[in-house]
Amino acid sequence: MLKLIMPTIMLIPLTWLSKKNMVWINSTTHSILISLISLSMLFQTTDSNMNFSLMFFADPLSTPLIILTTWLLPLMIIASQSHLIKETTTRKKLYISMLITLQALLIMTFSATELILFYILFEATLIPTLILITRWGNQTERLNAGFYFLFYTLAGSLPLLVILLYMQNTMGSLNMLLIQYFPQTLTHTWTAKLMWLACMMAFMVKMPLYGLHLWLPKAHVEAPIAGSMVLAAILLKLGGYGMMRITMILEPTTTSMSYPFMMLSLWGMVMTTRICLRQTDLKSLIAYSSVSHMALVIMAILIQTPWSYMGATALMIAHGLTSSMLFCLANTNYERTHSRTMILARGLQTLLPLMASWWLLASLTNLALPPTINLIGELLVTMTTFKWSNLTILALGLNMLITALYSLYMLITTQRGKFTYHTYSIKPTFTRESTLMLMHLLPIMLLSINPKIILGPLY
């Protein structure tokens, strides 16, 4: 585990000691090296998991998420160059240091064995993200977005801390590797139901569940490009990962308690896709599409069958790469037209033909076209949900239909039509941007050849 955490921490002195013209090059190349080192974790010789120490372990559920985290740092650094072009060198270095700190915390969160340690790291990831949003955001509303983000997350996860401390007292240990062998502590009393709610609420706010999702569009819209990427790709996955980990203590309450949340997810899935059709703001549209994808993941985790877990992990990885790519594309538009309104950035296909092909590929991946892993995840989740109840096919079918509609609506609005006059003299597509898009698409395409490496511990 140290082979990932130590180089990541050492990236901070590397960034601060780099010369003015080498900051971006050094941080990008070294973070790519770290992400290549992390690939070795995929080849696990044991069937169960790799125990690095008492503190850290990796199993087939956390490994793909750790690799996604390390893969995203170079992409965030590449994407942020244009955004920070007017900043002083010190501020650039500070910005990169924030991203590196966030990555180190996330790697440790995904590999923590102890639930209290997991909770501390889970909350610690809030701080760098908050600084990114409130310091480097674009509009003045970023402070409002930061408040929403902070209070939603904190209010949601405080009950979890109380319950974890209580469980530490009753069970004697909160080690994830031990907990699964303990006798079940929860009974069918109302206190057990409250405990279940307290444990799940923290992760449902983070996912976010429809109804608790108001912080997400705000935070996404106001965050700088790297903030949006890390929020969509990894911080939402923390919720899913935490839910999968904590449900093993909460047996057998989940089966009886999950119905209202599953109904809310199904309803929210259709509602957020319908909200997407009404959006004028590009970033807001992608943020709401994240909510609808994550609703599928919540459904899958609450059903608790091997297939649904496989679908949830596949969908989390797929969504991480896809939504991150869409945010990068939205950012390239924003850098050229200085507006997130879709109507003001229309007809760009004639001006930026290469970017239009990236837009097409990203939109098709987002609507889960075969052979992408998005399709594999959605199919697995849809099948298990249908097996759980046949009626859900109405909501799921409608969700898939509207997802296709808003993805194509986003593509057509930005790429087709007559372009506006203020876009005559825009900059061409840079190699940096094409590389960025390729580095998002490549894992999606390669994983569709061999998807079993991201299907989680039950494959």
Swiss-Prot record:
Major location (coarse): mitochondrion
Alphabetical UniProt keywords: Electron transport, Membrane, Mitochondrion, Mitochondrion inner membrane, NAD, Respiratory chain, Translocase, Transmembrane, Transmembrane helix, Transport, Ubiquinone
Subcellular location(s) of the protein: Mitochondrion inner membrane
Entries under InterPro entries matching the protein: NADH4_N, NADH_Q_OxRdtase_chainM/4, NADH_UbQ_OxRdtase, ND/Mrp_TM
Residue pairs linked by disulfide bridges in the UniProt entry: none
Catalytic activity: a ubiquinone + NADH + 5 H(+)(in) = a ubiquinol + NAD(+) + 4 H(+)(out)
Top EC class, one word: translocase
Entry GO CC: mitochondrial inner membrane; respiratory chain complex I
Gene Ontology molecular function, alphabetical: NADH dehydrogenase (ubiquinone) activity; ubiquinone binding
Protein topology in the membrane: Multi-pass membrane protein
Transmembrane segments: 23-43, 60-80, 92-112, 113-133, 145-165, 196-216, 224-244, 257-277, 284-303, 308-330, 351-371, 392-412, 436-456
GO biological processes: electron transport coupled proton transport; mitochondrial electron transport, NADH to ubiquinone; mitochondrial respiratory chain complex I assembly
EC number: 7.1.1.2
Subunit (UniProt): Core subunit of respiratory chain NADH dehydrogenase (Complex I) which is composed of 45 different subunits.
Recorded family membership: Belongs to the complex I subunit 4 family.
Function recorded in the entry: Core subunit of the mitochondrial membrane respiratory chain NADH dehydrogenase (Complex I) which catalyzes electron transfer from NADH through the respiratory chain, using ubiquinone as an electron acceptor. Essential for the catalytic activity and assembly of complex I.
Protein name in UniProt: NADH-ubiquinone oxidoreductase chain 4
Protein source organism: Dasypus novemcinctus
Gene: MT-ND4
